[in-house]
Amino acid sequence: MLFVWSKLKHIWRMENRKMILITGAGPNGVTGHLIKDKLSTKYDILTPSSKELDLTNDEEVDFFFRGKSINYIIHCATFRSNHNISHFVDEELESNIRMYFNLAKHAHEVEKMIYFGSGAEYDKSKPIIEVSEENVGLHIPYNKYGLGKYVMNTDCRRSQNIYNLRLFGTINKYEHPNKNIISNICLKLANNIDVTLKRDCRFSFVDINDVITIMEYVMANDLNHHDYNIVSDDSYLISEIAEKLIVISGKQSRLLFEQSGCNLEYSASNNRIKAEMQNFKFTDINYSLYDVFNYIDMNKDMYDIKSVDSRWNVHSNGQYPLGGGKINLYYIAAA
């Protein structure tokens, strides 16, 4: 009898689970895929690929929503100019705005829509220093990506149930070294080569697992605002992050920069989200860095160290300098 009752409760829970549409949860969508894995035991999850659902095509999106009882939209998909050239439109700014508004059009059908904004909304052509949400709009973003996110945030603030979780730097062990500077540093250390970077910079970071915890809070609770900076309590220089990782790795790699000084700061205040979640504690950055390094160290053979792009790396005549070469490097630290 106890077994039957337990089985009935399980069936009831399964039948009454809420449904989430997560965009950008395909094999290349690191954040969306991680959210899917974290929430799949609690919710029914819909994760159409870009081939199954072109979010830039309003007719396809309208058709997708027909007959579905979706409770939440988690919008993680981001269009970059080198992605999916078969889209209904193929220009970065227009594509990102179309994706957002094609989903926002259906926000009245769901409890909440959540998407991930960017610190680029504050305009990365200028220093962004401990900015609060009230600073959005003081400068209109110069680049297309930031402008698109700025337009979305303007609409989000006027909405009834759309929320912007604004990210700056994320710490995520699944991020590819081509796309994330912390993963980039970890891969170099795992391969016992010098950490060579272009220039130092101060960032605000957050552990991706904290982002998911905050997202779940937003789903379940009434909020006072519609956009929040999601960053941990302290900002860090890239050199400070690298030095922590050198200690964690136990390697004898050097930390080298091509240029002295610092690039434009990219940091934010988290006072608004902390006022909402007064008992929440952000993950200690040392724990987060340890987790990323261990994962990349164990999986370093998945990556081609020579193919790591030039976004943060020092290059000489198109060659990747494995810890040296005839380059005018600015040496700042050693293990």
Language model features with spans:
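Conserved Rossmann-fold NAD(P)-dependent oxidoreductase catalytic core, especially the SDR/UDP-sugar
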Residues: 101-144
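N-terminal Rossmann NAD(P)H-binding glycine-rich loop of SDR-like oxidoreductase domains
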Residues: 20-38
